[in-house]
Amino acid sequence: AAPAEPTPTSTPAPGPVADDPSDPVRAAEYWLDGAGIREAWEVTRGKGATIAVIDTGIGTPPVIFDDAVAGGTDVSGNGTPDGRTPVGAVDRSHGTWVASLAAGRGNPDGTGMIGVAPEAKLLSISLGFGASAAVPFAEQVATAMRWAVDNGADVINLSFTTNTLDWDESWDDAFLYAYEHDVVVVVAAGNRGSGTSVIGAPATIPGVLTVG
């Protein structure tokens, strides 16, 4: 006898998000409506996905990351093993801000910073720029990419750029490794505000999703 056809099932829509648009912090997140994020929450809020943030590190104090960070590491040589101590004297909070935009939890009463995917998990991978690192930058990125893939990342976020179109040879294998494991790599087209006329690596690497 022919096998029975599977019975289709629907995924239940997630419950409502604790969301107070009158909160000054929440009201300042204009992209929640402008980019259709609140509408997207009716379908998914990132549950089951893991986002690796390769940046200066996700700080430990903000309550918006309670139960959000599933793991981490440091590739700079100057951070802590869990990747939760921001690295660098300048813009050390950059990684925390990036993570809050990605998967900040907000507060239970609907106030505070909330991310695009507030039910996703985060991996905090701290790297250093320039003198803030004891390891060459290209080596840090290659190591971080492989660690993220090996530790369950579904998405890798790189909110930084360089001033050259080309990239270190070690990045070829590292980015290919992510591609071969079906990991989406999201990269900033630029990170210098106005005046940037050239899109640099890693945004120029084939296969990445470049956002500008």
Question: Which functions belong to the PLM regions below?
Answer:
Residues 129-204:
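Substrate-binding/access-modulating region of protease and related hydrolase catalytic domains
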Residues 6-12:
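Extracellular mucin-like PTS domains
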Residues 83-163, 212:
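Subtilisin-like peptidase catalytic core
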Residues 13-15, 19-119:
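Active-site core segment of subtilase-fold serine proteases
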Residues 64, 207-210:
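Glycine-centered tight turns that cap/initiate beta-strands
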Residues 1-4:
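Secretory targeting and sorting signals
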Residues 70, 76, 123, 184-186, ...:
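Structural detector of well-ordered beta-strand residues that form the stable sheet scaffold
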Residues 50-53, 155, 186, 210:
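Short glycine-aspartate micro-motif
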